[in-house]
Structure formats: structure tokens, C-alpha cells
Amino acid sequence: MPSAVEAFLQSVDKDGSGTIDTKELLAALGESGLDEKLVQEFINEHDKDHDGQLNLKELKDFLVPSCGCL
């Protein structure tokens, strides 16, 4: 059974790449009102390997300390 972070990644990762890019995160946020620039800044801040996407480790590094989810 996947962890909460793995389940989140799988639900947002529409192209099955194992990563989340700006467009996928924007789509997941739906009508949140966040603009693309803000979402890209968030990804850039947490994108430790600088590939323009968030992978499972990068998501865990952000989400686990922030919300305690596994």
C-alpha cells in the first residue's frame, strides 16, 4: 500500500513520469486561484535536483516535516 505522499504523487502525476511538473500541480490545484508563476516558484524551491519537477523524495522532504504525512 503506498504512503500518503506516494498516493498524492500518483494522483497528480497524469503522465506517469514519476514526477510532478508545474502543469500537473496547477491542474491538481484546480480552482485554487494560484497562478502558474507562484506554482513554478514553489517547485523551484523544493526541486533539489533542478530538473523542473518534483519527484517522490523531494515531495517527502517537503510534505513529511510540514504535515507529518508519510
UniProtKB/Swiss-Prot annotation:
<feature type="binding site">
    <location>
        <position position="15"/>
    </location>
    <ligand>
        <name>Ca(2+) 1</name>
    </ligand>
</feature>
<protein>
    <recommendedName>
        <fullName>Calcium-binding protein 2</fullName>
    </recommendedName>
</protein>
<dbReference type="Pfam" id="PF13499">
    <property type="entry name" value="EF-hand_7"/>
</dbReference>
<feature type="domain" description="EF-hand 2">
    <location>
        <begin position="34"/>
        <end position="69"/>
    </location>
</feature>
<feature type="binding site">
    <location>
        <position position="13"/>
    </location>
    <ligand>
        <name>Ca(2+) 1</name>
    </ligand>
</feature>
<feature type="domain" description="EF-hand 1">
    <location>
        <begin position="1"/>
        <end position="33"/>
    </location>
</feature>
<feature type="binding site">
    <location>
        <position position="51"/>
    </location>
    <ligand>
        <name>Ca(2+) 2</name>
    </ligand>
</feature>
<feature type="binding site">
    <location>
        <position position="17"/>
    </location>
    <ligand>
        <name>Ca(2+) 1</name>
    </ligand>
</feature>
<feature type="binding site">
    <location>
        <position position="53"/>
    </location>
    <ligand>
        <name>Ca(2+) 2</name>
    </ligand>
</feature>
<feature type="binding site">
    <location>
        <position position="24"/>
    </location>
    <ligand>
        <name>Ca(2+) 1</name>
    </ligand>
</feature>
<keyword id="KW-0106">Calcium</keyword>
<dbReference type="InterPro" id="IPR011992">
    <property type="entry name" value="EF-hand-dom_pair"/>
</dbReference>
<dbReference type="InterPro" id="IPR018247">
    <property type="entry name" value="EF_Hand_1_Ca_BS"/>
</dbReference>
<dbReference type="InterPro" id="IPR002048">
    <property type="entry name" value="EF_hand_dom"/>
</dbReference>
<keyword id="KW-0677">Repeat</keyword>
<feature type="binding site">
    <location>
        <position position="47"/>
    </location>
    <ligand>
        <name>Ca(2+) 2</name>
    </ligand>
</feature>
<feature type="binding site">
    <location>
        <position position="19"/>
    </location>
    <ligand>
        <name>Ca(2+) 1</name>
    </ligand>
</feature>
<feature type="binding site">
    <location>
        <position position="58"/>
    </location>
    <ligand>
        <name>Ca(2+) 2</name>
    </ligand>
</feature>
<dbReference type="GO" id="GO:0005509">
    <property type="term" value="F:calcium ion binding"/>
</dbReference>
<feature type="binding site">
    <location>
        <position position="49"/>
    </location>
    <ligand>
        <name>Ca(2+) 2</name>
    </ligand>
</feature>
<keyword id="KW-0479">Metal-binding</keyword>
